[in-house]
């Protein structure tokens, strides 16, 4: 089975590509070639935003799965439909759990929760993309599967709520130095974190699965924590008291 990963070097996609390779998938990464290619994977260097260049490099190629990790809005997926309509049996789009209705009308949030987020443009763009893909599936049978991750982290990007221009690790540095950190609200709101390795197991299970075509899934852990608990866990791992 062959898979084309558009991107493939981010927090989520790195873990998915590694696990897919371990499971026997022939993985090709399509990106601008700015990072080393992991062992066992093929590389195609192109900018996905250059449709003509990607069309040329795709000549004579087909894939069981096209895994799109960097598409943002409607224009991105419209381009992908043109590029991959005849090139794949399954197109998996990474959306976002932030697309779900805000404020939430009830819990738990499921895949059937309405997609309405007036507060964040990123989420609205993801919703726009989902609508285009769903319409293409219903009208032309475009083989889309939609995946909505929540807050995903790994060893290179620890889970924090708010950080400055120096990134997530700056928050851990502040905890180490005993400096105060900002926790959302009163710290009691619930949040779901998912390690990228756990996300990858769910994602790879959808790859090549015909029952996933035309459906949407969120992949998250099964544990919710308050933001106070999350930051207390970080401080405990650093063997420092939390100053918040």
What does each model-identified segment do?
Residues 205-244:
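Mid/C-terminal beta-alpha module of Rossmann-like enzyme folds, strongest
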Residues 3-23:
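N-terminal Rossmann NAD(P)H-binding glycine-rich loop of SDR-like oxidoreductase domains
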């Amino acid at each position: 089975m062959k898979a084309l990963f558009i991107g493939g070097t981010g927090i989520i996609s790195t873990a998915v590509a590694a696990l897919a390779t371990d499971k026997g998938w022939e993985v090709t990464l399509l990106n601008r070639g700015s990072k080393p290619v992991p062992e066992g994977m093929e590389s195609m260097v192109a900018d996905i935003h250059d449709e003509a260049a990607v069309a040329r490099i795709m000549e004579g190629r087909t894939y069981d799965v096209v895994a799109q990790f960097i598409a943002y809005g409607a224009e991105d997926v419209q381009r992908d439909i043109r590029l991959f309509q005849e090139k794949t049996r399954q197109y998996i789009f990474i959306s976002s759990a932030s697309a779900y209705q805000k404020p939430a009308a009830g819990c738990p949030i499921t895949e059937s929760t309405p997609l309405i987020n007036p507060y964040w443009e990123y989420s609205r763009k993801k919703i726009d993309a989902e609508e285009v893909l769903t319409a293409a599936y219903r009208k032309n049978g475009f083989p889309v599967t939609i995946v909505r991750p929540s807050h995903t982290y790994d060893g290179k990007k620890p889970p924090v709520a708010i950080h400055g221009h120096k990134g997530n690790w700056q928050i851990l540095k502040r905890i180490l130095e005993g400096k105060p950190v900002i926790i959302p609200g009163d710290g009691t709101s619930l949040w779901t974190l998912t390690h990228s390795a756990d996300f990858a197991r769910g994602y790879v299970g959808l790859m090549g699965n015909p029952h996933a075509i035309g459906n949407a899934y969120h992949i998250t852990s099964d544990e919710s924590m308050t933001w106070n608990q999350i930051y207390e866990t970080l401080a405990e791992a650093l063997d420092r008291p939390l100053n918040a």
